[in-house]
Amino acid sequence: MSSLPFVSDTFAADRWRQMDVDLTDMTFHRLISRGEVDGAPAGEDLPVTRIAFDRPSLRNAFRPHTVDELYRCLDIARCSPDVAAVILTANGPSPKDSGYSFCSGGDQRIRGAAGYQYETTQSSSDDDLATSARRERIEKGRLGRLHILEVQRL
């Protein structure tokens, strides 16, 4: 059972170490060894990370900020030579109805006529500024030729 609020009952918190990343819409953990059972000293990092959507009250619906955080977590895992596997999951259940959901899709509350918009009430962080800077550097003529995976990196 999980001792963390809004985290699945299948999540054993004592087996995971929270990564030192400032997140609001996601959680990011690293699997730790139990000792001889795992073939490594107890408490040592194992080559597995867990990235989870953490908006259970909205059935883990994503918004642009969520996508930015997901990309940041995946990029950290990609750049870590000792990570062999990434588990992508979601936290829950919903406090409203105790239902579980991986991700219900985009949060329609913030979808404008031109698509999904960043919330204006969100405070700007260095990561948000870096994301904005990357968007501005893209040549406008190339936007129509980007692969979906490249778009998600923006």
List each language-model region with its residue ranges.
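Glycine- (often His-adjacent) and acidic-residue-rich active-site loop
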Residues: 58, 90-152
